[in-house]
Swiss-Prot record:
Biochemical pathway: Amino-acid biosynthesis; L-arginine biosynthesis [regulation]
Family of the protein in this entry: Belongs to the ArgR family.
Identification of the protein by name: Arginine repressor
Taxonomic lineage of the native organism: Bacteria, Pseudomonadati, Chlamydiota, Chlamydiia, Chlamydiales
Chain's role: Regulates arginine biosynthesis genes.
Primary gene name: argR
Length: 147
């Protein structure tokens, strides 16, 4: 158990201090700290903590989300669309899991759940009759403005 805590702390420190542009870079930084971790383990950990890739001066870098605000979400959500049974949200690569978690927490009373890939989220409402209202609420929550 102590090893997992040490690995978690090392990973958090890497992302909070300098970030990393690839999972391989995270593996290399861990290795320099004496921690051997495979790319697939790093990938699972990044999903677990809802790490996202944020564009910056040095290119996109993995980072840990801190809070929801207009600047952190607005550039990550590209569209919110829906049909008669499903809402589909397109996001920046690597941010769908974190955004889906925000939606799950905020809309737990009106949705059955979310399914997130790398850059796409499927949202299933409890009642199909309310889908347009839920889609608009999600859109407003995520600060996405339709054309």
């Amino acid at each position: 158990m102590k090893k997992n805590v040490a690995v978690d702390e090392a990973l958090k420190e890497i992302l909070n201090k300098e970030g990393a542009s690839t999972q391989e870079e995270i593996c290399e930084k861990l290795s320099s700290l004496g921690i051997a971790m495979t790319q697939s383990s790093v990938s699972r950990w990044l999903r677990k903590v809802h790490a996202i890739k944020i564009p910056g001066e040095k290119g996109a870098r993995y980072s840990l989300p801190t809070s929801i605000d207009e600047s952190s979400v607005k550039g990550l959500v590209f569209s919110v669309r829906y049909n008669s049974s499903l809402i589909v949200i397109r996001t920046a690569p690597g941010s769908a899991s974190w955004i889906a978690s925000l939606i799950d927490n905020k809309f737990s009373e009106s949705i059955l759940g979310t399914l997130a890939g790398d850059d796409t989220i499927f949202v299933t409402p409890i009642a199909e009759s309310t889908i347009s209202f839920i889609a608009k609420d999600i859109e407003n929550f995520l600060l996405v403005f339709s054309d």
